[in-house]
Amino acid sequence: MNRTMNRIWRLCWKDLPLINFLFLAVSVSSAVRLNLSPPRDDLYWTFVFPLAVTAALCLARFRNVDHLERAFNLTILLGTSFILAAMYFAAKPKPMTTDELLCRYEFSALANAALIGVHAWRRSGRLAALFFGPVAAYGAVLENGGILLGYFTEVGYSMYLRPFPAPLATMAGWITVFYLVMSLTWEFRLCIPCLARSAIGSALVATACALCMDFQLDPLATAAGFWQWNHLLTLRLLGVPLLNFVAWASAVFPFSLMILSLQTRQSIEPEVLGCAENLKRVWRRIPLALAASAVLFFASMAVFEGGFSGPTFAVLENTLRNYGCALN
């Protein structure tokens, strides 16, 4: 019995990114159903996106693990489903103010990043250096860039790292996003041999995982007022400007491709990715990843908005004009 319990605890720690991924899904669903006033039951169903990722990973693992790990995976999946059902049918609403929700989000985002840091460090100090070095810097540029370009604002938080306009919580959130997404992708690569040989395929999986996470997260954040979108952005999905989801995909794909290309080319484990030489490579390629992200983003929005005169470019033009520049 002791041996089995020790094995289960090791599985819990090993699968902390997956458990964290599901915990975030439950937390978002809880806020949507119980804490928003009035409740946004129309958004509750979005838990299917992170749950689908979990189900796909459990299915991919099925042939590669023993009976205990299969039971563990099934328990995680069914347990999460039971909690979600219980919250919808049995839990009583407990409305919270915007300030209370914001405070809870801010604390949980920073605590989550700290937990991620401990998990990464226990796996490898070099892996922690990768996520709290270049990954953190890349995320900070993304978050602050969106604000500086005029697409959204993030006000009312208690902790800012001046002179950056983005709060510490949302910048730290990118560390969590990339760590969870990359950890899930590495698990998929272990189970699917052809994926382990394809950096592009793996980057697409990472992007899909990130979008499944954001399809649930951003509708809540928008409804709760965690960030405020520019009023010109009228093309929406799940109550969120379509631009947001395109931005996530455009940000995650090139950066994850850069990391996964290094791993595939060198045939190394994730724990070795943060070695000194690879860290230098990643730091040097951040500008290239940002450029690729910008090209993907603006090209995609031009397609969705039918040209370069849509809301995305109107916001950009207004912002540049405020900075004393112009597109034409």
Show where each model-derived region lies.
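Aromatic-rich, lipid-facing transmembrane alpha helices and their immediate juxtamembrane interface loops
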Residues: 2-328
